[in-house]
């Protein structure tokens, strides 16, 4: 009985435990359900609030373009340490020194380089009476610019941020060259106080070397015929000039009578153009300028002491003036570039070699682009460098014996391809050991050998170009003459089918575009200017093909449209080349710029520069025609 009661007691306890456990499970389930409900409500509220703040877009940027390099997640500890210590302070960004003086110096130097001096070159080519006044204004602004630089230097703290820089020296030299050039111009420019009525026009005598627009003049037979690419001069009242013009007219009439009535009008016009070419490139003294409108110049030119000084020094002054006119234009930009480098603290220490290598080479291609566009506009047409047909007579070479290009000209003349080949050969010869300057005293690395191999290419292609010019000498002479004439001693069709200058530019672009750099950013920029140079050389070869298939038969500039594209590629390629220095790349990477950012800016700047250069040539042509009709 007792055992039965014990068993019942155990069953009762077990039932109690089961009931308690079920109650606990129910409580736990209820708690869990309540927690899940709370979590669901919370997450729903969070989702609603976050969705309300999101702006829907089709795509979100997932690349690092435009992101400053310090925000890049892929930097190594060594790279992050370098960029955290990167210093962006320069002469341009600091507030030390007289900032107004520095800004004035920068603005005036840019004004001289891009506006005043180029405009003065156009006035000089047009023999305008405003040339000397503008040259004087140019000199005054240059003096004030150098003085402003001196003020900034004296007000800057004692610490020297760029030790042993040469910008101060180059600025002083610029001022000296400006002074010498101005006084040489004052002494060498012929001035006459005679009236306009004393000038008589002489047909088909060139006004200058830069004129490129064909004009209609009265030919010897009394009918209008197209002249060369240059307008007529107004002769001095001298028996020599008048006699020369008279003899030329008689010779043309005699040749016209011998041709007979069966000669077609087309052949007659071509013969007249050929005879006119002799007169067009004939040597003649530049016409005297009319009295200056500015009183100080009128008083100066009538002064007895000035006339005596000019009589003794005019020859020397004339040589100095012509030697400085265009080189001074290039030196202004050299000074400007050096100032940009010093102002941004570029090229300090061993980095000077990387800077010079890129800026010298890039500057050469940029200059070549400027010259190519000028040739398209008619620059140096008297030498046949404007893609124009030209012939030199024995009388011309005698009267221009002081000009070495006329005096020593071979039968095919000195072409622009000859000049380019010589410069390529010279640059390659001097550049062999320059590539090792950064590692002077150490072993030659693979990078040094890779660079010096390009110098070897320059030597080889430059020499091949010179030899090709020698072989094509007779070919140019025969293809330039319109008909046989005994007194023609040199002639050129305006080009030489010499592929080596274009070949050199093409392979320079290809080799450097594939040259591995320290970063992908730098490699991309090298690829950009490498391809641009290659494209430019391709269009230069198309120019040769066009002129070979459709030769230019007169002395007017042929203006092949392919040269416009060539000029753009050389200008833009040279500018991007100069931007690809190590320090320039680092400055752009630090600020998060992309390679296309600088490329876009370069394309826009070059387009504006080309437009400005063409405007200057068109304006110069208009000045020449206006001056001709006013005298």
Swiss-Prot record:
Residues 1-20 form the signal peptide. The chain crosses the membrane at residues 106-126, 132-152, 171-191, 323-343, 352-372, 408-428, 452-472, 530-550, 599-619. It is found in: Membrane. Residues 127-131, 192-322, 373-407, 473-529, 620-631 are cytoplasmic. Keywords: Glycoprotein, Isopeptide bond, Membrane, Phosphoprotein, Signal, Transmembrane, Transmembrane helix, Ubl conjugation. To S.pombe SpBC3B8.06. The modification Phosphoserine is found at residue 219. GO terms for cellular component: cytoplasm; membrane. Pfam families: DUF2427, Ytp1. This is Uncharacterized membrane protein YCR061W. The lineage of its organism: Eukaryota, Fungi, Dikarya, Ascomycota, Saccharomycotina. Residues 21-105, 153-170, 344-351, 429-451, 551-598 are lumenal. GO terms for biological process: regulation of cell size. It comes from Saccharomyces cerevisiae (strain ATCC 204508 / S288c) (Baker's yeast). Residues 220-239 have a biased composition (Polar residues). It is a multi-pass membrane protein. Residues 216-274 are annotated as: Disordered. Disulfide bonds: none annotated. PANTHER family: INTEGRAL MEMBRANE PROTEIN (AFU_ORTHOLOGUE AFUA_6G12730), INTEGRAL MEMBRANE PROTEIN (AFU_ORTHOLOGUE AFUA_6G12730)-RELATED. It comes from the Eukaryota. There is a cross-link at residue 250 (Glycyl lysine isopeptide (Lys-Gly) (interchain with G-Cter in ubiquitin)). Its main location: membrane. Glycans are attached at residues 87, 98.
